[in-house]
Amino acid sequence: MVFRRCFVASGLIVFFAFGCSGGANSSTENTTQVVQESNVTQLLIEAKTTQKAEDFFHQGNHLLDGQRYEDAIKAYDQAIAIKVESPEAWINRGIALTSLQRYKDALASYDRAIAIKPDKYEAWYNRGIALTSLQRYKDALASYDKAIAIKPDKYEALINRGIALTKLHRYQDAIASYDQAIAIKPDLHQVYYNKACSYALQSNLELAIENLDKAIELVPDKYKKLAKTDPDFSKVRSKRQFQELLQ
């Protein structure tokens, strides 16, 4: 079966609007102006600090894209040291950790993001991936459900939810999840392949072939090769119709 990952590409954007009054005549007005100037200075300092955190964040994203995961983590750590309440940095740090197979550390990072912003669907989605990698399928399912509740059109979460359900032997529920993903994005070749796996695990040769055929039609070489060795097809692999499809 095929997983889907995502990372947060959005930056930390802060907009400051400054206003100042005209000439001041009274001592009260002068005091107010001094306070305003002090506030403006503080805002400028905060803006520079935020910009520095954003620079480290974008550096981390660049390193993550380049698969330099250890360096990406260091960059995100620097961003977090400046701005600890940054869910985006915590999420992408978790993705780098997941890529290094440090799943428990990744979970801790996603949990920090969720504590800061509970409705951040990327945190729940990637948390589900880490839990799936740890074979904690029920917990993964709960995380994917959270992600989908926040962003119903997140078809990647529906795909991975289907995988978790398959691992729990809830094949019909898995297929329903895959069908929801297809309703959002009809040309999802990996979904047809995963549906084929779910049907094969139930010894449903006809529907396994039907869905595998759709996956092969979209990406021929990949899925013919996968299906030849994927253990999910062990119940139907010896069947003539299945063998003919892989020719």
What do the PLM-derived regions correspond to, one by one?
Residues A24-L44, E217-Q247:
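Terminal, low-structured helical/coil segments at or just beyond the last alpha-helical repeat
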Residues Y193-A196, A200-Y223, Q247:
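TPR/TPR-like (Sel1-like) alpha-helical repeat modules
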Residues A79, R112-A113, K146-A147, Q180-A181, ...:
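Canonical positions in the second alpha-helix
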